[in-house]
Amino acid sequence: MATSADSPSSPLGAEDLLSDSSEPPGLNQVSSEVTSQLYASLRLSRQAEATARAQLYLPSTSPPHEGLDGFAQELSRSLSVGLEKNLKKKDGSKHIFEMESVRGQLQTMLQTSRDTAYRDPLIPGAGSERREEDSFDSDSTATLLNTRPLQDLSPSSSAQALEELFPRYTSLRPGPPLNPPDFQGLRDALDSEHTRRKHCERHIQSLQTRVLELQQQLAVAVAADRKKDTMIEQLDKTLARVVEGWNRHEAERTEVLRGLQEEHQAAELTRSKQQETVTRLEQSLSEAMEALNREQESARLQQRERETLEEERQALTLRLEAEQQRCCVLQEERDAARAGQLSEHRELETLRAALEEERQTWAQQEHQLKEHYQALQEESQAQLEREKEKSQREAQAAWETQHQLALVQSEVRRLEGELDTARRERDALQLEMSLVQARYESQRIQLESELAVQLEQRVTERLAQAQESSLRQAASLREHHRKQLQDLSGQHQQELASQLAQFKVEMAEREERQQQVAEDYELRLAREQARVCELQSGNQQLEEQRVELVERLQAMLQAHWDEANQLLSTTLPPPNPPAPPAGPSSPGPQEPEKEERRVWTMPPMAVALKPVLQQSREARDELPGAPPVLCSSSSDLSLLLGPSFQSQHSFQPLEPKPDLTSSTAGAFSALGAFHPDHRAERPFPEEDPGPDGEGLLKQGLPPAQLEGLKNFLHQLLETVPQNNENPSVDLLPPKSGPLTVPSWEEAPQVPRIPPPVHKTKVPLAMASSLFRVPEPPSSHSQGSGPSSGSPERGGDGLTFPRQLMEVSQLLRLYQARGWGALPAEDLLLYLKRLEHSGTDGRGDNVPRRNTDSRLGEIPRKEIPSQAVPRRLATAPKTEKPPARKKSGHPAPSSMRSRGGVWR
């Protein structure tokens, strides 16, 4: 019964209908929900029954079960009120009583419903149909024949009724006919009978359908009544289980309370016994502590007495030491008087007799001292039990010995008075006295050691006894505490076991919740990961598009830049330009401020040059006599640039420059032959322009490329401020000889992603210093020939390739070590250092490789500086360039400008 009530398959349990108010609110809520569902089902069944009965009965008649419905409503109200009261009560007996009353009401309601069902049948065939278990075979012929639904609606089947219905047939008699038959009338009567019969059949069919509907409604009502009865029976059974569970719960509760009371009484008895034993143990411990305190006090008194005796002994030893010191002093006096003893030797011999007498007296005194020492020893042995009396007697003995010592000292003084007559005798007496004192001291030390040993033995014995008693008491206490701890540990283990079981249940629930949460988070994580993968793929596609666009832009800019270089290399200004006026040999400090010119310079290209131009000084001296070779006229460039560029004053035509081996275009073709990986901005590593840099101009540019080149040059020239002074400005340094590339400096082609294009505004003075290097002093500086009048001759033609070689080595070092692209700021600083430190090697006639060790140090120093962006502002005005010694040309610093060049 209890198992069925507690099983999850049962519709109602004991915990669901009756729950004490002390239970958690979850159980109350569950029980109230179950009860509400039960009553809702009852109400629905009653409503279905009421609707079925309303359809069965006519509107004039009233259903006979209105009293039963009212009784059921009152019962439901009483049940709801009782359940509400049950939520507030705490007594189980009241719940049981109310459950019994509810069961009685349910049984009466069930009995009344059965009685009314069997007592008031709706139709005569209802009882037989109930006995036949509500068979639904209403469509069968036997059922239709057995039922009599037309007794109340149709007339009875008696003879009169038949005669009324069929007057002609009833008039026919088996006897002879009264009148002759009328066939026409008979035919008409037959037709009328046919129509009447059809009408009757239709009426019978409609009545039968009505009967079938009523039978179906009756079956539904009966089924609803049976369902209601079964539900009431189930409720009665459930309430019986609840009552039985409550009775069993009350019995178990009383048994548990009785057991708990018995355990409480037993625990009180054990606690009282333990309290008594604890009080007894505390009393015994207090007594033991008092005895131990007394023993400690006696030991402390004995220690104090020993300390006093030790102090007296130390005082006596100090006095003896003083006497010994005096004896030493007397011995010294004796030694001093030995010189006079020789003369008195005879007198000493006469006094020997007196000395013998004195010896006898001293022997007697020694005997007396020995006897007195023996007496003291006996007294000390007799006084071992009482240490205080012994100490007093020992003090008395010490006082007597001190008195005797005083007597001896008086005798010594007397003998000192007679020292002149008996020095030797006195020495002997002193020796004997020292011996007696040593013996006395040794005996006294021995006595004190024996007394100390005996005292320590007694103290140790008493302490051992006290320790044994305390150990026994501690062992008994420990055993008692161990038993108590065992009992407490058993109870604690039981409580821990119950708590552990509860904790395991809670942990299992928590783990389930956490597992659900973890699954939810895993689902979210999987969704987010999928989303991240999609975003990463999209980002990768965008990055690829960006890289492709950057590469295209860099390729376009590189193509424009190559075309501009080729155009500038193939064009030359008109011949015979006016020579600039010669300045003083050493320009003053005010020259940069007076003569400022706007220089349109090429941006410095980070190209890789190898050590070239291995030529002698004589070959360079012979070359100025050669006629200059002009590549083209400036009209070609003016036609290319258009009137908008010609109107700008900052654009200056190029001066004719003599070339050693070929035209200036050849020099630029040599520039195009540099290593492609070491240019300033190289978009595609696979491109190699080859040795010819002006191939595009030789073949002819299409109009679209010419228009793009015009736009690019227009943007370059718009950044340069206009200046009308100094219309003749050198654009590029001379290139001497073909630029050969040795095979021992070839660097491996490492394809890498090019860096993005950066625009850095470099001061024009710094940019001009890259191409204008001070010329070293030469022997031809004073001449008036072309060698002294053109800046393309002399040291400039030698220093600039050397700087390019050093820059090429630096770039190759960056590439070989994998440090990436060289920043423009670091390259400018390095070139500036070369400009200031390059005066050492200007006197050399043959260009050589730079063996400076700073080439390996500068990359190491400049690599950390890449993390910090440095902006190079305009050069300070206080910085002065090195003075030129040539008289033909002013210093290049005079052509510096305060503007900037975009690179």
UniProtKB/Swiss-Prot annotation:
The ranges of region (Disordered) come to 1-34, 110-140, 471-493, 568-597, 669-704, 772-799, 837-903
Where, subcellularly, is it found?
Cytoplasm, Cytoskeleton, Microtubule organizing center, Centrosome, Centriole
Report biased composition (Pro residues) as residue ranges.
Answer: 572-590
The alphabetical list of record keywords is: Cell cycle, Cell division, Coiled coil, Cytoplasm, Cytoskeleton, Phosphoprotein
Recorded GO MF terms: protein domain specific binding
In which broad location class does this protein mainly occur, judging by the first location in its UniProt entry?
cytoplasm
Tissues expressing the protein:
Widely expressed (at protein level). Highly expressed in testis. Also expressed in spleen, thymus, prostate, small intestine, colon and peripheral blood leukocytes.
Q: Please indicate which superkingdom the organism of origin belongs to.
A: Eukaryota
Q: Which GO terms describe its biological process?
A: centriole replication; centrosome separation; mitotic cytokinetic process; regulation of cilium assembly
Which residue windows does the record flag with biased composition (Low complexity)? 778-791
Cellular component per GO, a single term: ciliary basal body
> Which segments carry the region annotation Required for centrosome localization?
365-903
Q: Provide the assembly information.
A: Interacts with LYST.
Query: What role is this protein assigned?
Result: Required for centriole duplication. Inhibition of centriole duplication leading to defects in cytokinesis.
Q: What is the recorded name of this protein?
A: Centrobin
Query: What is the gene called?
Result: CNTROB
